[in-house]
Amino acid sequence: MTVILDSNRVNSRSGVDSSLVIFLHGYGANGNDLLGLADQLSEHLPDTVFLAPDAPETCSVNPGGFQWFPIPWIDGSTEEESERGLLRATEDLQMFIKQSMEEEGLSEAETILIGFSQGTMMALHVGPRMVDSILGIIGFSGRILNPESLLEDCKSKPPTLLIHGDQDDVVPFSSLSTAESTLQE
């Protein structure tokens, strides 16, 4: 069953909507966590609508926040629970992206996903599996989930910018090179 994701919005500065940015927050946060970036970005992207959905599940280690899927080494969930959560979150996010584009009258070619940590994981999991390529993916401090399945399921290759600090103690810096090599195949 697909969950309709709650979302927050910043309208385009110009009032003319020609592109869409969807922010995907990290584990334990909510959509508002990244929405503040819209103020700075809208100066350079005045025709852009910014959306920031809350992930579909309440975070078990931070009940005030949300998670896209459970993370076993953080919350004690099983690998199976994590996989089921990822499948559900993928369906929910795909539906959110589709509905958002329809509501805004915009296409994949006018849509960018920007993620942080677990939000980057979702962007890299969903974006390349879309039949029509999105405008791009920008990811901070994330990784590719199941690189082998992405290679099998990849339908498009959106331009992707990945940024990752070498002192990250949550998502290893080595995840950046794995993502780079997977996305270039």
Name the predicted role of every residue range:
Residues 2-110:
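Serine-hydrolase catalytic machinery in alpha/beta-hydrolase-like enzymes
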Residues 159, 180-185:
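Catalytic histidine neighborhood in serine/cysteine hydrolases
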